[in-house]
Amino acid sequence: MSLLKKCIGLDPNIRKPLDIGLIWEGNYWDDKDVHDCCDVDWETCEILVRKIAKALVLPTSPIDNGGIENKKILIFLPKVMQLPLTILAAYRVGLIGIVMDPLVSKNKVLEKIIMCEKPRIVVTVDAVWQAQELIEIKSKVEVRSIYEY
């Protein structure tokens, strides 16, 4: 059984719903020892994965409802809590997730991936904190180019 299949199923014989499923240590901190972190239980992980999966296959999403099994999506996320949840959600609904980190990816590489792989959806965030610096992500993506292939 693949790791993704093991992560998607909430088998009560293996783990309990309220056991910790995801530990997140974020990227924001300041001089007063304030930083973002959290523990997410398996039940909450399951709810979040279901919500993301549903959003990926909504009738308003650019994916046609007929045969979504082999459709590719670009998961253009840095190392944020939404990344593993989105990967699991894509797998759950039969989508192929292409993962790119916007903090280390060059624009030319992003453009080549979009042109070669032709993803139907780009999943990203508006911005992320890196220490005390706000880094805008969404503004770097030109979604227009995806629909012009």
UniProtKB/Swiss-Prot annotation:
Identification of the protein by name: Uncharacterized protein ZK112.6
Native species: Caenorhabditis elegans
